[in-house]
Swiss-Prot record:
It comes from the Eukaryota. Residues 116-127, 153-184, 243-325, 365-397, 423-442 have a biased composition (Low complexity). Residues 228-242, 398-422, 443-457, 496-509 have a biased composition (Polar residues). Residues 112-131, 152-325, 365-457, 488-509 are annotated as: Disordered. Residues 189-217 have a biased composition (Acidic residues). It comes from Dictyostelium discoideum (Social amoeba). This is Putative uncharacterized protein DDB_G0267716.
Amino acid sequence: MSKRNSTKNDIKLSDVGVAQWMDYQIILQEWKIGKLSSEIKNSIVKDMSSLSEFRGQSINANELESMIGDWSIYPITNKFKIIALWKIIENHRNKHNLGYILKSNVLEKTNKSKQNNNGFNGHKGNFSENEIRKTNNYRIIKKQKIEFEKNNKNTIITRKNNNNNNSNNNNNNNNNYNQKSNTTMDNNYSDDDYQNEQNEFEEEDYDSNDDENDSHDENENFNIIKPKTTNQLKRKVSSSFTNNNYHVNNNNNNNDNINNFNSNSNSNTSNNNNNNNSDNNINNNNNNNNNNNNNNNNNNNNNNNNNNNNNNINNNYINNNNNDSWNNQFQNQLMYCNNYQAQYQQLHPNHYQLQYQQQQQNINNNINANNNNNNNNNNNNNNNLNDSTPNNQTNNDLKSSNHSNYDFNYNTNERLSHSPIQTHSSSNNSTPSNQSPTFPSNYISQNANINYNPNQGSMFYPPQQFYVESMFYQQQLQQQQQQQQQIAQQPVSQQNNNVETNQDNVQQQ
């Protein structure tokens, strides 16, 4: 291959297309890096090892070409490695005058000696002078690049449709979803409107700086799949709010509580009837769970008070049922709780039976502890039964711990006993213990601002509770580390005494 003038025929940074890092991968695959001398390749490897993109990776100078080929399989994941290697090789090309390491079939040659009948230059194919020839590797990477840009636009359109149609879906799904499956949820929004929006995004210029300055994970763009039609998208969104079966696999018969939520959201013409039905569904668990032979009179009074509290809670929820943000939050929490519950049930199949028993005990304890408060508020709650507007009494009921079908602190210590984190008792200084720490009953109410609807069922774990428990574990571990540092600063003789006392404490426990 004859040498070509590097200043004329070589590929420059300004020649790179829209998504620069994708073109970097194309050019890296076409360079004959394996033909370089061992000294230059070792220098490239040395520069790569000094960068954070290649930290912890063993790089062989003789395997640079194969490594670049592996990057083409997952170009999005290796985006920053591709950019870093491009810059390193550019520096070495300028330093060592490596203007001829391109393969012979990369640059398109112009045959100016051959002319046609019209006096113009000979046919050059579909490529202008000094452009990259469409080799096999180029076609593969170019296809990935086009799909990347297309997915970016589809992701933006999908997110925009979700935001614009949430209110329409939530207002119309109760009346339209029970009709034919192909019925459009919103007649004002057609497939033609969707196509017009897509054309508007295609006309906009794609900013290449968004790829380089984007600090988020690029893989999240490929995890979002756009539905085929707008109707399919709307049915998908509405089904999560109107379907009467959430496929919650548990052993505690929470279908009554879940159907209570559905009955409230699926009634637009007979709210009073549905309110009575939902109250009956909620209070069935109360009547079934509070069969205590020793406290029949107290339980009857408490059940009446709980009925009034539940009426206030349901009235408050019905008035705020059109809150789109709350619906979206509930959907996310429901998915999170279902996934966690399914995984936890596989690890601890017998845990839910213990949890159910502990829940019943906590319910009875709360009833006995709040007898006086419920008796004093009985008259106020009865006055609020026919009032559908939220008031101060409703807010107090939401904050009260006397909800027999959802106890926030139920079985917390038993669940913590399964945790893999080994904590230390705070009563003995730096004494290890095999028992789980006692979780304070008022810890959550003091350290978390929780806005959670109790009608969602007793088996739904709120994500806020896991956050608070993790903070509790973190405090325990910090106390342990501080105690160990204090022991390390003491003299050796005193450390031995502390170790002996710690061992005695362990034996006593």
